[in-house]
Regions:
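A short alpha-helical cap/connector motif
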Residues: 2-7, 11-145, 152-173, 177-221
Length: 221
């Protein structure tokens, strides 16, 4: 009798394990309402992003960096009308994080806020209308992901203000580090950003070879 009960119990546990595995698999593969809203917005506006927004391939790269490293505390310098912010916040909606994004132009800021609402991502974004030159040094942090896509002549200054607020393992990215010929921006065109971050021993920097190029720097210590 005991053997029969043991057999039934084992069968029950096996069935429970199989069912649980299927349920988890289905949950991971399920498309959320936010996923649907974001995909619809990105598709509907695919050829209408202007005002210095990132191309889709770069947005996807930002998304992947956050998901792969489970980043949660993000900062964006230069919102524009929200394309990159949507990709970043979409990833943060899955990791449980939040984005602070800063834009100085009122019209672009207001359009970005509307786009965030359409994408269903507003609760994951703290959008601020401000001068990043003044605001970034005042932010407390810490941050584990940063995306810089604003005035190129200030990139190094942004980096200097942000680096002390980066956690170990954090990722600092900067857009448009290539010139129109596909070469690294140097001298006046790049304002020394790449040279600066590559000179820091505690940063490991590579460049994602997209249209404009994204410098990706990981803080090792």
């Amino acid at each position: 009798m005991r053997t029969k009960r043991t057999g039934i119990l084992l069968l029950f546990l096996v069935c429970l394990f199989i069912f649980s595995g299927q349920a988890v698999s289905q949950e991971v593969g399920q498309e959320t309402e936010i996923d649907k809203k974001v995909k619809n917005l990105l598709q509907d506006t695919k050829y209408r992003w202007r005002d210095m927004n990132v191309p889709e391939v770069d947005g996807q790269k930002l998304y992947d960096l956050i998901i792969e490293n489970n980043y949660k505390k993000a900062l964006e310098v230069g919102t524009s009308t929200g394309h990159s912010g949507i990709w970043i916040a979409w990833a943060l909606s899955k990791t449980g994080g939040k984005l602070i994004t800063v834009e100085i132009d009122k019209d672009r800021y207001e359009e970005a806020v509307k786009n965030f609402e359409k994408a269903g991502l507003s609760k994951f974004i703290d959008a601020r209308l401000a001068d990043a030159h003044e605001l970034i040094p005042e932010l407390e942090g810490p941050f584990d992901f940063v995306f810089i896509d604003a005035d190129k002549n200030w990139y190094t200054n942004y980096a200097k203000a942000v680096i002390p607020k980066l956690e170990k393992g954090a990722c600092m990215t900067a857009h448009n580090v290539y010139d129109s010929s596909g070469r690294f921006r140097r001298g006046r065109s790049g304002h020394g950003y790449l040279e600066y971050v590559k000179s820091l021993s505690f940063l490991e920097t590579t460049v994602f070879s997209s249209g404009g190029g994204i410098a990706i720097s990981y803080k090792k210590e």
